[in-house]
Amino acid sequence: MLHCTQVCLSALTKRTHRVKVQVLKDFPRFQLYKGQVANVKPSLMRNYLHNFNGAKYILSEEHDINTELLKQYQTLEAKLEEDHQQLSKRHETEVQKNMELRKESVFGHKKEEKPKEEKKGLLDSGITIEEVKIPGLDI
């Protein structure tokens, strides 16, 4: 008799369906690295990862996972996490220093306060009419 060769799936099941794979090569474009066990879309596996032995399908967790590669990936991931934490701490201290410098540049250092000299205008000065001499004017 005839057997069904295709399964009719809805758009939701196609969109959410993932397959479990172990990556055998680095794929930084997809943020997948050697030894990593990941759930990816079947199309990604078919079109990119499976080519040239870049990844393998995992059908049973006990037998198909290469534990040596997985341990290498876990040590690499731990090292990268430590480096990332150190980098973030350095970045945070640099940001704090920059903020302090900006505050100092905006608000300025505490300047030595000089006594302000009052501007003496013409009306404020003690000049009287007797002191002013205008040629040709006799008072």
From Swiss-Prot:
Assembly information from the UniProt record: Component of the mitochondrial large ribosomal subunit (mt-LSU). Mature yeast 74S mitochondrial ribosomes consist of a small (37S) and a large (54S) subunit. The 37S small subunit contains a 15S ribosomal RNA (15S mt-rRNA) and 34 different proteins. The 54S large subunit contains a 21S rRNA (21S mt-rRNA) and 46 different proteins.
GO MF entry, a single one: structural constituent of ribosome
GO cellular component terms given for this protein: mitochondrial inner membrane; mitochondrial large ribosomal subunit; mitochondrion
Keywords linked to the UniProt accession: Mitochondrion, Ribonucleoprotein, Ribosomal protein
Localization per Swiss-Prot or TrEMBL: Mitochondrion
Family assignment from sequence similarity: Belongs to the bacterial ribosomal protein bL9 family.
Protein name per the record: Large ribosomal subunit protein bL9m
Domain of life from the UniProt record: Eukaryota
Gene name for this UniProt entry: MRPL50
Chief place of localization: mitochondrion
GO biological process, one term: mitochondrial translation
Cystine connections: none
Protein's job: Component of the mitochondrial ribosome (mitoribosome), a dedicated translation machinery responsible for the synthesis of mitochondrial genome-encoded proteins, including at least some of the essential transmembrane subunits of the mitochondrial respiratory chain. The mitoribosomes are attached to the mitochondrial inner membrane and translation products are cotranslationally integrated into the membrane.
Region annotation (Disordered) ranges: 83-121
